[in-house]
């Protein structure tokens, strides 16, 4: 019997999730204990439909090296959620397919829902006496997985966000003879890690973004307007960063308040997301120049701002996952253990995936100012090491040269 390795990607992509794939695949191909490395096309959902590929040719033709610096999910993704009931027929169907393909090692690269899949598969394996070793490799730009210092994908997304906010601030400062407000809406529905990283854009104390709002603290539109008025007495060009999920603390997202704002000359509601709502609110209450910007998916797919630290850790976590499985670990997620901020020292370990899935890690309240409008120095010490170093992405005809499935 062969001892084959099966790997897949799931959930939203990141700029370095393929770095983790590179780590798993390269380590698997190099290890004599593993006979074949098989990729699942579109995760567990694709595997159920028998969509797989042999990963060995990618090393032979040089594609594997390009995969390392390609954003998105090379193998494709899915949002397939396995049933809670472990007696559901999908489980024996999956394990029958594992047997047919002689799978001894299963790796799933993803976030919270992916770790839920790892948990269910490993628990089912235990009930039927399967010796398949099942390991989760973390990824998420949201940085909200528990029991790990941070997650691959966050450092590059944070670097992109902070870089873009710094560029927006430079653009806004051009017309410094009239008051203006620029509102930057950043991903993060329940956790504000990405928005908090915008604080890294500041060149000095008091620099833009002057105001930063996270979903961890209840948001008051009235207090926001007063804070904007106060800050405009000190700077004419105000940049404000908000998480898309800012809310009133009682379950109502700010974007849901849009019906309270007026309509345009055609009777259309002036709304989309939280940023647009606040843009209209500032326009209505203060009557000054204001615009809102959504960073949106660029935060997770930009190769131009890859953090070398992030990419290196993504690949290393993939390699460590293979080693952990070969050492007999199963039902675990690779976690990141920080030993020091300065110098930055990181170690890898494993944590019980059942203690991770379906939980969220918020930005600590003590890292946010009491009025909820700024970020403290503790966060800066935490985040700054994660954005260090640049990555030279292969270029062709003046544009990034990415890998893609043929």
Q: Which role does the model predict for each range below?
A:
Residues 14-24, 47-48, 91-92, 112-120, ...:
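Short glycine/serine/threonine-rich phosphate/pyrophosphate-binding segments
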Residues 50-104, 113, 141, 163-166:
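Glycine-rich oxoanion-binding loops at beta->alpha junctions
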Residues 10-12, 40-46, 79-80, 111-112, ...:
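Short, ordered loop/turn segments at secondary-structure junctions
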Residues 255-406:
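C-terminal non-catalytic interaction/assembly regions of soluble proteins
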Residues 4-14, 73-79, 104-110, 181-186, ...:
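Short glycine-rich or small-residue beta-strand-to-loop segments that form or flank ligand, phosphate
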Residues 40, 97, 105-110, 116-131, ...:
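Accessory alpha-helical/coil subdomains and C-terminal extensions
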Residues 1-52:
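N-terminal phosphate-binding or glycine-rich loops at protein starts, especially the Walker A/P-loop
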């Amino acid at each position: 019997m062969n001892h084959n390795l099966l790997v897949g990607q799931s959930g939203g992509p990141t700029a370095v999730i393929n770095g983790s794939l590179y780590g798993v695949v390269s380590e698997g191909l190099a290890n004599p204990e593993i006979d074949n490395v098989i990729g699942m096309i579109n995760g567990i959902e694709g595997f159920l439909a028998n969509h797989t590929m042999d990963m060995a040719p990618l090393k032979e033709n040089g594609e594997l090296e390009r995969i390392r610096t390609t954003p998105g999910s090379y193998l494709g993704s899915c949002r397939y959620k396995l049933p809670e009931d472990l007696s559901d027929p999908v489980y024996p169907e999956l394990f029958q397919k594992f047997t047919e393909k002689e799978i001894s090692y299963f790796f799933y690269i993803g976030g919270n829902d992916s770790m839920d899949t790892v948990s269910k598969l490993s628990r089912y394996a235990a009930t039927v006496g399967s010796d398949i070793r099942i390991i989760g490799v973390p990824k998420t730009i949201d940085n909200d997985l528990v029991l790990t210092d941070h997650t691959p994908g966050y450092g590059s997304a944070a670097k992109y966000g902070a870089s873009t906010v710094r560029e927006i601030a430079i653009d806004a400062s051009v017309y410094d003879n009239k008051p203006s407000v620029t509102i930057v809406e950043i991903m993060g529905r329940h956790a504000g890690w990405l928005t908090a990283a915008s604080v890294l854009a500041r060149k000095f104390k008091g620099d833009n973004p002057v105001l930063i709002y996270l979903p961890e603290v209840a948001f008051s539109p009235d207090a926001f307007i007063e804070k904007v008025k106060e800050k405009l007495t000190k700077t004419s060009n105000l940049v404000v960063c908000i998480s898309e999920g800012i809310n009133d603390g009682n379950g109502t997202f700010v974007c849901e308040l849009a019906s309270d704002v007026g309509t345009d000359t055609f009777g259309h509601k002036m709304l989309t997301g939280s940023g647009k709502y606040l843009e209209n609110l500032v326009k209505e209450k203060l009557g000054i120049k204001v615009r809102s910007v959504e960073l949106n998916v660029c935060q997770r797919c930009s190769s131009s701002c890859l953090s070398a630290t992030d990419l290196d850790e993504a690949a290393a976590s993939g390699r460590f996952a293979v080693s952990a499985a070969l050492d007999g670990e199963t039902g675990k997620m690779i976690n990141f253990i920080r030993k020091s901020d300065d110098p930055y020292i990181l170690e890898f370990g494993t944590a019980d995936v059942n203690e991770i899935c379906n939980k969220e890690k918020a930005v600590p309240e003590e890292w946010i100012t009491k009025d909820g409008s700024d970020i403290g120095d503790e966060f800066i010490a935490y985040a700054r090491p994660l954005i260090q170093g640049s990555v030279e992405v292969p270029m062709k005809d003046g544009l990034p040269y990415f890998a893609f499935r043929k």
